[in-house]
C-alpha cells in the first residue's frame, strides 16, 4: 500500500493498494514518542491506537449517530527515504458523493458570510454535533478536542451544510485511560477547553470537559460568529474567559436561538449536568451514565425542538 506525500494545508491524500486503484482519503495523524532506547511506540500507545481504530472502523458507527468518518486503515508512516516519522496515519474513507476539500465549521463561520445557514440548519448542525458527543460518551470514549475546526462538511456547494462529521481524534481515548497528552497552550484552542484543562492539566479528563467544549461550539453555532472574536480574551485567566462566555450566552443567544437552546448551552458551560452525581460513589461508569441521562434531557432535548424551523 502506497500513500501519496502530504500536501500543504490539506488532509486529503491518495492511497494505492497493491494491485488496486488509487483512492482519495482523509488523513489524521497521531504522533508518538518512541520508547527509550527503541524506535517503537510504547505498549500503551499501541493499545490506544488499536482501540481507537476499532471504534472508528465500525461500519455501523454512522448509522448509530456517531457522525464520524469510516476508518479504512492505520499506517505507521515513513518518509520518502523509509525513515519512521514517529506518527500513525489514520486513513478515512470520504463520504459517498463528496468532492474536493471539506470545509470546517470554523471556516464556514469566518470565511463564507454569503452562505449563512438558515435557523433550522443551525439547529440541525448543533443537534448533529451534540448527538456525536452523546454517542461517543455512551461507549465510554472521550474526544478531547471538540472545537469548530474539527467539525467538517463534505456536502456539495449547493448543500454546504450536509454530510457533517466530527474529526480531530489525535488525543481521543477511552475514559479509563488516564494518559495526559494535550498540553499546548494556544488561546485559539484553549478557549474551547475547560479552565481545568488549559496548560499542563492537573485533573483527569472527564465527560464534563468534552461537554464544556461542546457548549463553546454551540455558542458559536447559535451566534454564527467565531468565539475568539467576541472580545479581547488575550491576557484573561481561564476562569474569567469561562465567565465571559457564559455572559455572552445569556445576553445574546435568546434573541437568535430562543430560551431552550440558550439553556442547553448554559448546561454545558455551567457543568450543571453533574449536579447530584458523585463519581467516587458509583464508579466512573455510573457517573457517566448519570451525566448522559441529564445530557439527553437538557442538551439534546433543548436543541431538537428547533430543527424543523426554517
Range-by-range predicted roles:
Residues 1-33, 63-69, 78:
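ATP-binding glycine-rich phosphate-binding loop
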Residues 69-121, 176-182, 187:
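Conserved structural core of kinase catalytic domains
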Residues 131-142:
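Protein kinase catalytic-loop region centered on the HRD/HxD motif
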Residues 147-196:
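Activation segment/activation loop of eukaryotic-type protein kinase catalytic domains
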Residues 210, 214-215:
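Alpha-helical D-x4-[hydrophobic]G micro-motif in the C-lobe of protein kinase domains
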Residues 196-208:
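Conserved end of the kinase activation segment
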Residues 62-70, 75-78, 83, 145, ...:
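Helical subdomain adjoining the active site within ATP-dependent kinase catalytic cores
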